[in-house]
Swiss-Prot record:
Keywords: Ribonucleoprotein, Ribosomal protein, RNA-binding, rRNA-binding. It comes from the Bacteria. It comes from Bdellovibrio bacteriovorus (strain ATCC 15356 / DSM 50701 / NCIMB 9529 / HD100). Residues 157-187 are annotated as: Disordered. This is Large ribosomal subunit protein bL21.
């Protein structure tokens, strides 16, 4: 059995066990509620509403409240110097279709809804990154730190010596050119 539901001004075809992304709904995470705006129910027999099917309802569970990937909005008018750049993230709600009921018949899902708290997942990942950084810093012993510092100093000294050599060469060649000019003027 399937149903066509309307939410947020859009229509979605759903079956029991489907996961659907709809525009943001003001429902708590893990909340179970019914959608009564059913436009059509199909399957063994089809019922089309005018505009809604009476007695039909779809039971859903909120599994995620999040934002979509960042979309780039770029506007330009050529030869006018007009350029606008913006980004946008659309909020959405992910729904798990638990059951579709109509005319005494009910199509239920065998699966259970898995609720994902996006904020908690992000916080866990951030904590894991911080812990990994601390562990890496703790694993570096004082000997490694000293070696690294010594390498930096050695590189700097080598670089200073190379710079001094190039400066000396440049001044010698410059002095030779000046001397050559003076001798050519005298002659």
């Amino acid at each position: 059995m399937y149903a066509i539901i309307r939410t947020g001004g859009k229509q979605y075809k759903v079956q029991a066990g489907d996961v659907v992304q709809v525009d943001k709904l003001e429902q708590a995470l893990g909340a179970e509620f019914e959608i009564n705006e059913v436009l059509m129910v199909g399957g063994e027999s089809t019922a089309v509403g005018q505009p809604l099917v009476k007695g039909a309802k779809v039971t859903v569970v909120v599994t995620k409240q999040a934002k979509t990937r960042k979309e780039i909005v770029f506007k330009k008018k050529r030869r006018q110097g007009y350029r606008k750049f913006a980004t946008h993230k659309q909020e959405f709600t992910e729904l798990f279709v638990k059951a579709i009921s109509f005319d005494g018949k009910t199509a239920k899902s065998d699966e259970a809804a898995t609720v994902v708290d996006v904020k908690a997942v992000r916080a866990e990942k951030a904590q894991a990154r911080v812990a990994a950084r601390k562990e890496r810093a703790a694993n570096k012993g004082p000997a490694e730190v000293v070696k690294k510092a010594a390498k930096k100093v050695a590189k700097k000294k080598v670089a200073k010596k190379a710079v001094k050599k190039t400066v000396k060469k440049a001044t010698k060649t410059g002095a030779k050119k000046k001397a050559a000019k003076k001798t050519s003027k005298k002659a």
